[in-house]
Structure formats: structure tokens, C-alpha cells
């Protein structure tokens, strides 16, 4: 009769060949039922107790199953270094960007930038590395030293005395447990040592190799000879020095370059996007990171299956818990500048500012006519983005483009809390008349105040469904919306994490988590009638990545509301939010009133245009500047120990404190001697430009018009011959003679009869049509200039209070649109305004050349212009 063997299923154990989970025990070993393969990691051990412990049969003989550790060789096969880990993650991020619509050339450019970075780090692609092994850098991870050089780290022992047996020394149960544990350890040690090779035979450690920068950094803490001893210490027995200096002990450049983390991947992608001139700019990359389209939550999905199976242990080895996932615009630009300098990048590629301005105008829901006006400003004097103050700075392309849009809105509407209101009121009245005579198809004018209400309400609506959008624009949302956003991310992370099982933990923790979740879900179901997942899915809208988030997200919400299931949504869209302000007419505000006047004349209306100037009561505060504290080196301080408290306090009150932020009037002038010197330099510069054969400045050609078989230069014609009298628009064909009779009158009687005839004609004319008044800007605006460098938080608050409310709102809205603070955008606006208002010498002669003025006696204005000229 054959022996019937019992089968059993071991927890968290499976066959290495067929992945089976059912095993049979034969002579102390376990074999898979499906394929018959022996499981080496487990073994049955018989434990027999002595007679003095227990007289029962169960006490004399016990069968147990012990688990052996996996072979270290198999574990090392699945281990990867930090460079390999981030290489997989970088490939995953790159694929995400390609799915979002990035150029295919981004793949090759990312590889080139990443290879250049690893080459400079002496990790790979290095010709000077003869051994071919990657060299360790500053703050190298222990897993890299263990995998590459088989180097073990020194682990400090626990403080305190060793644990000893406590309680009654004659306790039989304690003695039995001690004997049982010793027996198991002996059996396990014999099983491990059977047939195994010794450590000295199978494992050979190599000396640690450090990069040049790492040796220079570690040399501050120990001599190089002592560092070599640490490099030869394969078992990590030396505990005198740490081979990982603290972060605060490193220089700023070492921290930003040699400490490999997830931010370096964002930097590599940012440089590659700029090199291929992709539509995705740095601000878009930051928004994708903030919206978690690129996040470390999905890192394990980018790794191979055998590597990702380690889960939390792998993330712990990479020390990802100590790294920040979100980055700011300033931090990323600083890291890009450092890496560009590190890999010897020649220069950045300037993106197409015209297409960038078109995208931002669409995002702000502004009319396309504004794009034509902004493009004319860009073409008038194109920016070079050359910064002569710092090395390898990443230019603010997005901020400069947005500054041009802000400057154009400032010219068209004034933004002084009075001019834009008057312009909007006159445009709103004309729109009411246009709706009466033309209906819904009438060409309505752009109203600035209505557009402000639309943009502000759009912020609130989109923020209700997107918490990242709410944080960027500073919109406060309900706690329920924030909880739903957290739950959506947790559910998404759980779905991705369950593939590898790294989030489940132990069985007890899993059961505890399931029980708590079930209790809370039951309470929510009883109280609110729906679970948390049902509530989240009802109000949750999944937004796809977009380069115009506000425009795309709002249209997505409108589409959801228009559907049949949109009635379940708690939010209500007002009717005025369905108005397309980008389709409004902006031509009359740039003095192109021909089409509007013709349309009104067809309906018996007349248009009168009135230009508005800036406010007269604008405060003249001057130029603002932060004061730097100059500390003298040769100062001597003496303490007066005999002074009384009252005397000391009175002296402090009498002492005048110098402010750190002030406004000064531009009244400074140069001395006669220095002014003569700069005048001579300017004359010498002009003479050199004239004598330079490569300096070709041609005058604007004069156009000839043929009138009555005579060729007449266009510049010689008067305005009465080339422009219309009513609107001063250029004529298609110039007049031969002015329409007004300017000859001298020789017959006074004839003149009297002519005047009587004109009077009779006026009396016979029908009554004058209704006149509509349209107020526009005279293209003059207020200026508040100064120096934004090294300005403090309190100074920014003081400066912000001087801005008009409308300008302050538009400044912060435009800054939040591209993900920066308002100070950076205002600094770019100052660069544009100072160039156009103070630096260009003669606008009337700009057809020949644009010359930055050098010989001016206004010292403060010249200093301001020269400072911002270096940033143009």
C-alpha cells in the first residue's frame, strides 16, 4: 500500500519553476506537486524535548517548518544601481511626454543630455575611466557601493546593554524556549553551510573608486591616504569617518549636481525640451509635475517586473522618502543653469515667441487682434535674452512673452482704475445698441470689466474640479473637494501599486486596513446614502494634459454640464460664462474704426471716438530701490558698562534709523567733466559706425505715386491728400488735390451767394443721426520703475500697494497662468518698459535705426536703462 503524502500550501511561497503554491513534505524537504521541484528555502525540522520539560507526547516530539533565506546570488541579480533606476524612470517620464504630444526628436536629445551628464559624473561614457566601473560621487548610495564594489557599510550597534534573561531563573518554560531557539539556529546553520562555498572564495570586493569631485569633497574631512584605507575596507569595519558627508556641509553646486535624485530627471527633460524647441515650455513641465502627470507615484510601473517586485525595499534603498517630488520654477531654473554649465552646453534655443504669445492670449480668452499688436511690439525690437550678469542662466521666455501681453493691455486700457472703467462703460453702451440693431450676429466690442468677471469666475469653477489649478491661482476650495482629490490619487496609486503588491504590507496590516475601510464606508453609506468612491466619481472629472489648461478644462466642464448626466453636478454655470470673449472686436481700441463706423452708418448711427489720457492725480513716487547695508571692515566697537538704562533707551530713540527701501526722484545729474567725456565717447562711436564698411544702414526708400502723369513722392503729400477727414484712415488712392478749397477768394459777392446756398442745403438735410461715443486710450500709461533685485518680502508688499487694483489683478493672473510669482513677471515688464520708454533715443527716426541713448544728463534714468539693458 502506497504511502499517502499530505499536501500543504505555504504562505507567500511559490515554486520557482511553475509558480505553484501546493507542496508535499518528503523526508524533511518540500516538493512542488505540479512539477516535483524541490523548494530550497524551506525545510521541516523535528524537535524532541528532554524528559524534564514535558511528559506529554506533544511536548516530546514537535514537527516544525523553518524557512531559509534565499540565495544572495539570486537576490543580487535583481538589484540595480541608482543610475540604472533613474534611467528606467527617465525613460518612463519621456514616454509620458511623448504621449502628451512632444516632438519625436525629444527622445534622442534626452539621451544625449543624459549621456553627457553621466559622462561628466564619471559614471558612464567616460574615456578616462580605464576599469570601466562607475565611480562613486558625493553622497553615493550604499546600494551602489555594494552592487558595484561589493562594499559593506558600517552599521552602528544599538546603544545600551545586551538583552538578558529576566524573571525567575528556574522557569521551565523560559528554558524550553531558549533551548528550542538554539536548536533551530543550529539546524539552520548546518543547512546553510552544507555544500556552500566560503565568502572568501565566492565574493571578492574591489577598492572603491571616487570621482574627482568626490575626492575633493572628502578631502575636507580626512586625508587622501586615510580615504584609501576606507576604500579598501570591504567589510565596513572602520567607523572613524563617514563616507557620506552631510548635505549642509556641501557646496551649492555639489548639492545641485552630484546628488542624483528625481529633480535631475526634470532638469534633463527641461534642457532637452528647449534644445528641440518643443511647444512644451518649462512652465508647462512644472504644471505637469504639479498635476502629477509626471510623478514618483508611478515609478514602479517604469521598472522591469523582477525589479519592481521588491517594492518598498527598492524605494528605501534609493532613499526616495527624503526627496521632494514637487519643484518650483526658481529651483528648476537654478538646477538647469548648473547642469548646463556642468555639461558644457553652448547656448539655449529661443522658442517662437509669436506662437507662445498666441497660446497665452488663447489661454486668457483675449481677442486674436491683440496678438497682432503684441507681434508688432516683438518685431519692433526683438529681445535677445542675453544676461551679462550671471553665467548660464535659463532665460525667462514665458515671463517675457507674458510681459509683452501685459504691456499691450496697459497701453490699450490704461489699467489705472479709471481709464479702463470709462472705456468699458462706453463699449458696453455701444454693445447694447449693436444688439438692438443687429441682434446676436452683431460685432460686439470687447469690454474689459466683463472679461475680468469672466476670468475670475472661470478660476472658481475650474478650481472646484482641479486642486492643482486652485493652488496655482490661490483659490480657496471646500474641504470636500480637497478630500475627493486625495481619494482619487489614492485610488489611482492603489490600482497601480496592486500590480506589484508593494503597498499591501503584511497580512495582519492588510486585514486591519480592510476592516477600518469597511467600517468607515458603512458609516458613510448609512449617513449620506453613498460611499466615498461613489461620491468622488460623481463630482470627479479626469482632465487630460493640455498646454492651455484654463481654456481646455473650462470647455471640458461645459461639455460635462451639457450632457444628460450633467444634472447630477452640484455646480451651476451662469449664462454670462458662456460668452466667448475671444470673439469680441478689439479693432476700435487700436484706432481701427472703419468697419465699426460703416456698420453703424448702415443702421443710421454715427460713431465718435474720444481718446482718454491718464489720470492727472497719479502720485509721483519716483524710482524705488532696496538699500544694501555696507559694512565697514575697520570698525571698532566698545562697550560702555557704566551707562544707565534710561540714557541708553533715550539714545536709541534719538538715533535715526535708515530705511531699507525708499523712493527717490530722478533728479541726479552728471558733472560737467564726466558729461563731456560721455558726449565725446558717443561722438566717437557714431564716427566709427559711419566709417565702418560692415555697418550698412540704409534709409527707408521713398515711394513714388503717379498722379496726373506725374511721379510725386509719398512723403511730400499732405495729410489732407492721404487720409480721410473723419477717421484719419489711409486712403486707397491719394487725392490729386486736397478736398478743401484753400485758394484765396477773389469775388466776395460770389462767396456770399455760395454761403447762402450752403445754408439752404443744410436746412434741407434730414436731422443728424444718433451719435455713439467710444472712448479709447491715447496709448499713454503710468510708469513705476525701479530695481527688483534683492528686494525683500516687506518691500514687495509696500510696492504692491502702489499698484492700481486692475493692474494688480491682471499682473497676478498672468503670473499664475505661467506658474511664477508676480515679482518675476513685473521685473520682465520693467525690462520692456525701460527699453521702450527710456532707452530708445528717437522714436521718430526709428525707421533707420534703434539706438540706445548714451549721452543723456539724467543720471538716474541712464543708470536704470543700463541696468535693464544687460537683461534684454
From Swiss-Prot:
Residues 85-312 are annotated as: N-terminal cyclin fold. This is TATA box-binding protein-associated factor RNA polymerase I subunit B. A zinc finger (RRN7-type) spans 6-40. Residues 41-72 are annotated as: B-reader. Disulfide bonds: none annotated. It is found in: Nucleus, Nucleolus. Zn(2+) binds at residues 15, 18, 32, 35. GO terms for cellular component: nucleolus; RNA polymerase I core factor complex; RNA polymerase transcription factor SL1 complex. Residues 187-206 are annotated as: Disordered. The gene is TAF1B. Residues 73-84 are annotated as: B-linker. Although it shares weak sequence similarity with GTF2B/TFIIB, displays a similar subdomain organization as GTF2B/TFIIB, with a N-terminal zinc finger, a connecting region (composed of B-reader and B-linker regions), followed by 2 cyclin folds. GO terms for biological process: nucleolar large rRNA transcription by RNA polymerase I; RNA polymerase I preinitiation complex assembly. Belongs to the RRN7/TAF1B family.
